[in-house]
Amino acid sequence: FVPFRSPSIAALPRRKESVAFAQELWRDLLTHWQPRLLITIDTGTFANLQSILLSQAGARSADHEHFPTGWGEYQAEAVRIARPGIAPAVTLARLPHLSRFALFGRPASRPHMDRLLSRLAQGLADR
């Protein structure tokens, strides 16, 4: 989301200005590019992109679902945002950070990831 390298958002130099720049960048990008699926790995990026998408004319949240991950209380989530008259609906998903949580190939996470991935694929198949 923020196009500047940093080990974490907390360590990002000039964080406030960097996030403001990223919000404007994505706002402009999403007026010209109409993705059907966006996947994030942190809550801040998810919240920022959701806010930007919902600020588009006529956009509305069609459904929001949380998914267990097999890592205790850590969850993934997906929200479908309808954009009538603008573009096809977009599904915005958030996973726990993949460098910290092995979600794919881990037996305890497999049924949960299968359910999430099925939901994301359904969003791509819907017209």
Where are these regions (language model features)?
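Proline-aspartate-enriched helix->loop->beta-strand connector
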Residues: 26-43
